Amino acid sequence: MQYPEPISKLIDSFMKLPGIGPKTAVRLAFFVLSMQEDVVLDFAKALVNAKRNLTYCSVCGHITDQDPCYICEDTRRDQSVICVVQDPKDVIAMEKMKEYNGLYHVLHGAISPMDGIGPEDIKIPDLLKRLQDDQVTEVILATNPNIEGEATAMYISRLLKPSGIKLSRIAHGLPVGGDLEYADEVTLSKALEGRREM
């Protein structure tokens, strides 16, 4: 079907989002067209504002509007424990359960040789620099329970074993192949509680 150019561009823009195929993009485009103009403008401003004003924390890699982020700046948090996650959304999922009080390190990915992603392509070197601080006594590996997440956890575990830092892996209360961001607070809490030493 041939659409007027503005609709075609809107559909193409929606299709750039993950999980949005042609049919969903058409539905979203027509939904946006049916919205009040002020609501559409607010939505557009929110997108631009987020893109312009958010950055990654220079310490942990979490998404933030200040640097360092509010988690790294919080002196009430346990500075001796770092929880390593793959993505900023994983930090948000962990924070929702309100049981973990340490710091984080966001890798921004996982080792995936099939996709050409090696240890140097994610934030493992930054993690190693952070761990030179004698204050850190435990690292919790909370990468996703899929092949890439497990490979990443094993790689980090082998790197850190000689350091004497306590290493643990969150328990598999999480479904294999699942992502942290989709887990509910109870499941995440149990997984953190049942973490195992590596």
Curated annotation (Swiss-Prot):
Chain ranges of the Toprim domain: 80-175
GO molecular function: DNA binding; zinc ion binding
Matching InterPro entries: DNA_Rcmb_RecR, Rcmb_RecR, Rcmb_RecR_Znf, TOPRIM_dom, TOPRIM_RecR
Zinc finger (C4-type): 57-72
BP GO annotations: DNA recombination; DNA repair
Keyword Zinc: yes
One protein family per Pfam: RecR_C
Residue ranges of the TM segments: none
Record key words, sorted: DNA damage, DNA recombination, DNA repair, Metal-binding, Zinc, Zinc-finger
Keyword Transmembrane assigned: no
Superkingdom as given in the UniProt entry: Bacteria
Coiled-coil annotated spans: none
PROSITE patterns, alphabetized: RECR, TOPRIM
Matches recorded under CDD domains: TOPRIM_recR
PANTHER family, A to Z: RECOMBINATION PROTEIN RECR
NCBIfam families reported for this sequence: recR (TIGR00615)
Protein family: Belongs to the RecR family.
Known role: May play a role in DNA repair. It seems to be involved in an RecBC-independent recombinational process of DNA repair. It may act with RecF and RecO.
Protein name: Recombination protein RecR
Organism: Bacillus pumilus (strain SAFR-032)
